[in-house]
Design a protein with these regions (language model features):
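N-terminal binding-site loop/beta-alpha segment at the start of enzyme catalytic domains
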Residues: 1-82, 133
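Beta/alpha (TIM)-barrel catalytic core signal, keyed to glycine-rich beta->alpha loops juxtaposed to Asp/Glu
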Residues: 144-331
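Conserved beta-strand positions
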Residues: 18, 55, 85, 137-140, ...
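Short, acidic/polar
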Residues: 32-45, 113-129, 178-182
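Active-site groove signature of glycoside hydrolases
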Residues: 127-147
């Protein structure tokens, strides 16, 4: 496993991150697996040299953080791993996240967002669930239009100064919003973000327009989520019936229907499949190799419900694509509506 700096920071992270959203309770999402099924996956990830583990307080309403903390204490030393979590959404099983379908329950005051009150309460609750006295990377899950940017950045700075987080990161927002937050931090001598966790894969490349160039210019590391487009790039959907998934997640993941399956998306999967067959590797490995090789990308966040899936992702780091192969994969792309910021 190779290790690289997270953006312009001195923090060394593996070229693959294990996403912990898959681990928790099926009460939250039907495709989530419980702790016993997660145990061998986390153990294997540590054995393979993965040191970056990404979760969030809202995943399974805190259950993901609890599992993350217990399994990492079982299989790794605290000083050898990088724990990342997030704040913004309500921590309640009734709330599935900003992109989840269906009616949204009424939010109670201060149960979400990025106010000083919310951030201070959320970091303490996350640390308790994780069973640690600090997180390495504390990320804001979304931009909060209801809280002054100055208030949010000062609160995050105080979390770092209190020793409860080593670095801060952000996720899924417009480039102008992220630039504004970084500017406020710099102007006021506050802690700046070292990472951006954004929606980026072969069938969703809208981040290449503004966010990625900005991050590369400013030394912000990219930690893309959904590198396989929720399994689509691995082949979990058929063109003739995109609503009939081939995996447990595909059969129940209504968010994917909102994000993907345009006509051009299937053309990308066809190009991906042809190249994978020619190279003698899986579709997923080609998709990971393309993403890991994009300028500015530090580590794709890989979700896994089986051990072989994390092994496959790590092997993908050895797959090097030529300029001609990259062009072959990218040629069918068509613009998409901007999705993932809600």
């Amino acid at each position: 496993m190779d290790y690289v700096n997270l953006g312009a920071s001195g923090l060394k992270v593996s070229r693959i991150a294990l996403g912990m959203m898959t681990f928790g309770t099926p009460e939250w999402r039907p495709w989530v697996i419980e702790e016993e099924a997660a145990r061998p996956i986390v153990r294997r990830a540590v054995e393979l040299g993965i040191n970056l583990f990404d979760t969030a307080d809202m995943y399974s309403a805190g259950r993901s953080e609890e599992i993350t903390g217990r399994l990492l204490r079982e299989f790794a030393r605290r000083d050898e791993i990088v724990i990342a979590t997030k704040v913004y959404f309500p921590v309640d099983l009734a709330f599935k996240g900003g992109n989840a379908p269906g009616p949204k329950p009424e939010r109670r005051p201060n149960m979400s967002g990025l106010s000083r009150k919310r951030i201070f309460a959320a970091i303490d609750a996350s640390l308790a669930r994780l069973g640690t006295d600090y997180v390495d990377l504390y990320q804001i899950h979304r931009f909060d239009p209801d809280t002054p940017v100055e208030e949010t950045m000062e609160a995050l700075h105080d979390v770092v100064r209190a020793g409860k987080a080593r670095y801060i990161g952000a996720s899924s927002m417009w480039a102008w919003q992220f630039a504004k937050m970084q500017h406020v931090a710099e102007r006021n001598g506050l802690t700046k973000f070292v990472s951006m966790q954004n929606h980026y894969n072969l069938v969703y490349r809208e981040e290449e327009r503004e966010m990625i160039p900005f991050c590369r210019d400013q030394g912000v590391g990219l930690l893309p989520w959904s590198p396989l487009a929720r399994g689509f790039l691995a082949g979990n959907r058929a063109k003739d019936d995109a609503t009939a998934g081939a995996t447990a997640r595909a059969k129940t993941d209504e968010i994917a229907l909102k994000f993907y399956y345009q006509e051009g998306d299937f053309a990308i999967v066809d190009a991906l499949s042809a190249l994978a067959a020619a190279r003698g590797v899986s579709n997923a490995q080609i998709a990971y190799a393309w993403l890991a090789g994009r300028p500015g990308v530090t580590a794709p966040i890989v979700g896994a419900s089986k051990v072989w899936q994390i092994e496959e992702a790590v092997r993908a780091l050895d797959v090097k694509l030529s300029a001609e192969e990259i062009a072959q994969l990218e040629a069918p792309y068509r613009p998409h509506p901007v999705l993932g910021h809600a």
